[in-house]
Structure formats: C-alpha cells, structure tokens
C-alpha cells in the first residue's frame, strides 16, 4: 500500500471539496459534507478535509500504477476546477497515513 498527502491553501476549500466529490460521485462512490469527503475509486481512495484556510488530501492505493493514477486524477481535477485561482497539488509520500472512510455522513 502506498500513501500520500497534499495540503492546498485556499479560502474556498469547502467549495472545492463539495465540487470534487459531487463530480466524482457521478462515476464512483463519494461521500461528503461541507468539511469532509471520501472518494472510493476502483483503483484507490481519497480522503479530503476542508477548513477556512486549506484543503487536505490523503490518498492510498495498492500499487505504483494505481497510486500514480489517484494522484493524477485528484491533482488534475482540482487544478482544473480552481481555474484562475491556480491551485497546485504537491504530494508528499508517507510510509503510512491513517486514512479512514467517513462513517457518520448520511
């Protein structure tokens, strides 16, 4: 299993979280509220946490190919959705991240 995290500074973190999860939910399973999101791609998973100043992504995937794909999909979508704000996603890989699915969101 491979893990990575990215912290993106933005005052619109909740807006981007909801937009990303709503978009992904059209093709894969996504659960979210205003401040937390969980996307279960067929090739990996992504946890999102938003507050007033940042959007934090935590991802995991079983192998190198799927890991690269999750990183690309999340990065590409946020960078396109952010338009003129020009947000950048810079991944930091970790040997382990405690990335858990959201259980208390309807």
Task: Indicate where each model-derived feature is located.
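Terminal, regulation- and interaction-focused segments at domain boundaries
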Residues: 1-13
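A generic structural signal for beta-strand entry/edge sites
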Residues: 3, 34-38, 52-56
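Short beta-strand-to-loop capping motifs
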Residues: 8-10, 59-62
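Beta-strand/loop substructures that line and gate deep hydrophobic ligand-binding cavities in soluble
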Residues: 46-61
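C-terminal structural segments of small proteins and small subunits
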Residues: 61-102
């Amino acid at each position: 299993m491979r893990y990575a995290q990215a912290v993106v500074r933005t005052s619109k973190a909740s807006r981007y979280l909801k937009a990303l999860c709503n978009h992904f939910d059209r093709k894969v399973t996504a659960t979210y509220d205003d401040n937390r999101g969980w996307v279960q791609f067929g090739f990996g998973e992504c946890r999102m946490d938003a507050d007033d100043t940042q959007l934090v992504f935590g991802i995991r995937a079983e192998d190198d190919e799927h890991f690269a794909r999750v990183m690309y999909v999340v990065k590409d979508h946020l960078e396109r959705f952010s338009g003129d704000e020009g947000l950048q996603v810079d991944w930091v890989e970790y040997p382990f991240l405690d990335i858990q699915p959201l259980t208390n969101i309807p």
